[in-house]
Amino acid sequence: MAGMVIAIGGAGVAQQRGEWPGITGGYTGTRYSTLDQINASNFNNLKVAWEWRGEKDAGIPLGGEVNARSLPIYVDGMLITTAGPRRTVVSLDPATGKTLWTFQEPVTPRQEYSMRANHGKGVAFARVNGRGVVFISTPAFFLHALDAKTGRPLENWGGAVPVLGFPKTGSVDLLKDLIADWEPWTSLKQQYDPNAGIPLKIGYITSSSPPLIVNDVVIVGNSAEQGYNQTRIENVPGDILAYDARTGKHLWKFHVIPRPGEFGHETWENDAWKWTGDVSSWAPLSADPERGLVYIPTNGATMDYYGGFRPGDNLFSSSVIALDVKTGKRVWHYQLVKHDIWNYDTPTPPVLMDVTVNGRRIPGLFQVTKQAYVYSFNRQTGEPIWPMEMRPAPQSKVPGEKLPATQPHPTRPAPFDLQGRTEDHLIDYTPEIKKLALAEAQRRGLLAPLFAPPTHRGNAEGAGPANICPGGGGGANITGPPAADPTSGVLFITSTSGCSLTMLAPAKERDNPRMTGSTISPWARGGGGGDAADAGAGRGRGAVGRGGAAASTGGNPLAGIPGIFKGPVGRIVAIDMNTGEHLWMIPHGETAQETQDAFRNNPLLKGVKVDTNWGRSGHAAMMATPTLLFATGMTADNRPNLFGIDKKTGTRVGAVQTPSLGGYGLMTYLHNNKQYVVIPVPGGYTAMALP
């Protein structure tokens, strides 16, 4: 077998053919294509080439949540993706969007329970013995290998799964391999049921991102239920699994929660390593085939906002881990957040590209984060490209919680969005406005540092919910992964300036017995707050959104101003990773016109020049080509658009209206000498091309 041929430092052979062989464009997470048929001179001529909707065009039930998370791959003239809560694999005609074939895993209780069923982000591709093969990991946590041309399960691959309706070959039960040496399962001494999986009282595992095939090895990540909903402390660890791409044979497993004798075991006190879990890799993986390394971004441990039952730094949660592809051995790691209680999962695949720093060529790895930092490493050694500082961290007053004394902070590049909320972040168009904004921030308890810990109900200080900024939605997040130009070393990041007002309450008050685990935590999120605007209202018609808005009720002198903290509320930032310098920053899309008008007409701003475009809350879907950054966004008249942006200046050079607003990235391919741009939209895709 020869896997995808992608040059780490450049666009690679596959992309030179106009292919998009992985959901991020290849192994590197750059979302970069060498295609330039669409450029600044003709961008505004783009038209809808075809549209595909899973329910209408393939009979795929969409379920309660409409999927807009998956991106197709394009290789060997085939366009292949996933759709729907059963993660149906679909092959589409690249020129028309017509459905060519589908593959759907039989229904199981494991699939029906999955909280990530509609979170599928796509498929993986490799050549096995000269044949194109598609790999898919499913909500029920099975792995399937399919013939890319027909969608049929691969012969003599994997084994027979003893569940009604499953193919006789071409499948692997990932759960069985995951729990084979896990004590909470083995101590139950009960027969394994591949249909039902494991009892919820010990945990549940699923998947959202596709596997990655590197040097004949299929590497599989996973995900758990959303940690912000958890109330119980038991769960299964999200260990990384690997299989032979040619046979389906299980090769190795990496323990994300170290066991006795393994590196990092001492970071789990209270014997929490025995029974708690998560630390999954729900974001897509990246890899360097030439170096034989795969890079794993992980999330936090069980329960996003309380970790008193798991004292210690909790390796390898909220980290980037480099593993040897052949052996699964750890080569290096860096923990971005110690003892994560902020929902600061590592949310996007690491971006791999070579850069020149102070005259020295470095194989770089760049990890964007919810906390609005870019962490920069030598991807071979794990050495930070610029110094990291361990700075004192705020401490928790929640009973039972013990936080690390310090947290790591990159010294370069500067944060790409607001961190915490300080007086320097307040709007200051005039001294009077600054004074009013400060009073509002103090009244609502909104001033807080980065890594402000959650408060708890009934605290002695009478404090309200902690203002965690950025919140669990970022900063950066998977809803808008970064893009990069590996030829110049420039990284493009989309971020949002939202915060999360977070207070804990006794977990027994909001316990849900359908969730995993059996022991109720002392505390869980739910004492008040939630995703919040920076300064109150503003969620109504024309509102900017989670970035914050001043209350619009009568008598408020700040009425109409979108927020008491500086905008934009959503942004796109370009950073030269050769120097760590910010090149430009623009708002993500355009604030609704009625909001801009109310902003401009505030009496306190009479005679003051103000930029009323604070963009839109949320993230853009992006990709890069030799001349352009493509990004989705809304215009002031509330119409979804695809924008063409000059990569050097951030200037918009084109805009075309699209049927729906996209998310989770873009992709492009060349088919029959025509370049297409595919936008994931609710329930399917819209493809744009020149007439």
At which residue positions do the language-model features occur?
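Bacterial N-terminal signal peptides
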Residues: 1-9
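Mature N-terminal segment immediately following signal peptide/propeptide cleavage
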Residues: 12-57, 72-74, 382, 573
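N-terminal pre-domain segments of enzymes
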Residues: 12-38, 405-439, 525-549
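Repeat-blade elements of multi-bladed beta-propeller folds
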Residues: 20-24, 64-88, 114-142, 203-232, ...
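Short, solvent-exposed loop/turn elements at domain surfaces
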Residues: 27-34, 56-62, 81-82, 89-90, ...
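Short, polar loop/linker segments at the starts of domains and inter-domain junctions
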Residues: 30-42, 60-68, 267-270, 467
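Extracytoplasmic/lumenal domain signature
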Residues: 44-57, 89-113, 143-201, 233, ...
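Long, low-complexity segments enriched in small/aliphatic residues
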Residues: 407, 411-498, 571-574
